[in-house]
Amino acid sequence: LKSFEKIAQELSGQVSFCVISFLDLYEKTKRNFPEAKEVGKSDQEFLTREFVRIGKQYGIPIRTCCENPDLEKCGADVTGCMTKEVLEQATGCRLQIPQKKKAVRDGCSCLLGSDIGMYNTCQHGCVYCYANYDKKTVAENIRFHDPASPFLIGGFREGDIIKEAKQESYFDAQLRLF
C-alpha cells in the first residue's frame, strides 16, 4: 500500500483512473509461482478500500478488472476498465457499439480485447504470467523469431491456427448540434 500511495502521488493529475485486479491462480501460474496464494474475499475488500482511499486522496478513481462486483461496496467502480464510456473519453469520439458485441470473457464488460500474441513467447519472466508454460519453452520459441515474418515467431508451421480478425470501426460519424 505504501508503494501504491507513492505511485499515486507521482501520477496525480496525470491519469484518469487506476485498474486493479487480483491474482487468478491458473494452472500455469501455480506451476511457475508455487508460493502464490489466492487473495481471499476479506483481503480483497480491505485492499480495495485502501486503494480507493489512497486514490481519492490523489484524484485517481479505482476500477476493477473482472473482479467480484461486490467490490463496489468498497468504493471501486466495477463497470469495467475498457467500457464504451472510457473509450469515448480517451478518444474524444462517440462510439456506436453493435448490440451483438460480446464480452471478452465471463464477468468482463470491456469492449475491446483480442489475443494478438502467442503462448510461450514473452521473455519478461513474470512468475504470475498465465501465458508461458515455462522458461525452457519460451527460449525454444524465441530461437524461431524472424523479424521479416508477419508471424510473431517464425513462419507458418503444421498445426498453426490462423484466425482472420475482422476489423470494424465503432466510430459514430453522425454529427450533432448538442
Tell me what each language-model feature is.
Residues 25, 69-70, 134:
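Short, solvent-exposed loop/turn segments at secondary-structure junctions
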Residues 31-33, 38-109:
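A C-terminal junction/extension of Radical SAM enzymes
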Residues 132-178:
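Short Fe-S-cluster ligation motifs
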Residues 106, 114-133:
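Local cysteine-cluster metal-coordination motifs and their immediate loop/turn environment
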Residues 1-51:
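Conserved AdoMet/S-adenosylmethionine-binding subsite of the radical SAM
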Residues 14, 57-58, 125:
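Structured helix-beta-strand junction loops
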